[in-house]
């Protein structure tokens, strides 16, 4: 958790650089940046699942493709606070809510909740 919030601090400490990266006329730069973060996040998630012997993949609750989609959606949302020049205190509030939302979903994937068929 501390590492995550340190990354938010880093983004806001280097806000102008991130704003340039995320909104530059070269869309491929942002897409490549996002893709690299998502790939790293997805790889770490898959390693965690293997190391913890979680059955999310073997049960079919998670596929590498779904992991990629969820990670991409999260980081895209996280970077929207920069794209829209959101003040840090407001961004932190929104990101906390996003994390609670995604945490509930990941719990369902990791531990199953019986709602997979609904």
Show the residue positions of the predicted features:
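Short, hydrophobic secondary-structure boundary micro-motifs
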Residues: 19-22
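Helix-rich interaction surfaces within compact, conserved domain-sized segments
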Residues: 56-61
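Generic alpha-helical secondary-structure signal
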Residues: 2-3, 94
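C-terminal peripheral helix-coil segments that are non-catalytic and often amphipathic
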Residues: 13, 43-50, 67-118
